[in-house]
């Protein structure tokens, strides 16, 4: 059935899909008809253990019963009002309580919208135009931050300048991730409005910040009066209720959010200092609006998700799943291909890089053996485990990845590693 769907889809969609990474499964993507817990159920009557989880939002797993119940209750009350609703206040209160930087919040509809708005705020706040980003960091599909972005361009060899005006390109400066000295040099020599960073890179595989890297960014931006923006679309509420900023004890001026705070429904948010967020209309003169901003259905799903995170041991279960899997995987790979791989991980996020011993930035990640990763992916998929088809995405676990799921995964991993 998936092949049939693919052939039909190719008539209607560019490349047959509506987001390019979905086409990375070869020879054609499989089509999912339903999902529950840690499992996907395909149109080809296959059950797959899912370690993609919608590329990050589903920290509770698929169709969590409590979230589902709350969504259905809200559907019965209506799902779009065009007015404020009490539920948006409740979700904002939760985020503000847990996230160190979140004095005030503006909800939007995607991570892309959130980073667009964060740049607009940084420029308005400082009166400057130039933004520093990092090679391989992905901040959404808009013109200002596509340069040297992550997985999509590395995987599909896209010319990132296609359709982007040179005037926009000229406002962006790029440093290598973990290179704070580059940031300081640019901050000294140019009028920098802000620095935007994934505190943990999640769209180039998983790449962790070096010791003191985030602290140095905070020091530099304070010294030169520029705005520090953490893009926590992936890490927000995944590394813990306080996100990466809570984990690393570094508080940015602005934080962009998405994924988990919408409970699997479309969402984005910019959170940060009161004096910056209050520049937004109608309080200030920086424009933002959206028909679906803070729509009650998404607010309900996000609030329900955070309520589960607060009262149950979600992070403990998801993190334990990674630790158990990696213990087995490292041992198996050490025997099969010693000194020829590295696994980066934090919390419930990890990625395997073959053919290299260290990955601390995008340049090093690109040296990994993509063909071996693709073989690893294909072998796992054939045996019923779905990890990202791209080397430069993140493998996620969830609250649904309990012992029975993990044990099945371990059995499959042992067989797959022997076939590499």
From Swiss-Prot:
Reactions the enzyme catalyzes: (S)-4-amino-5-oxopentanoate = 5-aminolevulinate
GO MF terms, alphabetically ordered: glutamate-1-semialdehyde 2,1-aminomutase activity; pyridoxal phosphate binding; transaminase activity
Taxonomic superkingdom: Archaea
Pathway membership, UniProt: Porphyrin-containing compound metabolism; protoporphyrin-IX biosynthesis; 5-aminolevulinate from L-glutamyl-tRNA(Glu): step 2/2
Class of this enzyme: isomerase
A biological-process GO annotation: protoporphyrinogen IX biosynthetic process
GO cellular component: cytoplasm
Family: Belongs to the class-III pyridoxal-phosphate-dependent aminotransferase family. HemL subfamily.
NCBIfam families per record: hemL, PRK00062.1
Name of protein: Glutamate-1-semialdehyde 2,1-aminomutase
Source organism of the structure: Sulfolobus acidocaldarius (strain ATCC 33909 / DSM 639 / JCM 8929 / NBRC 15157 / NCIMB 11770)
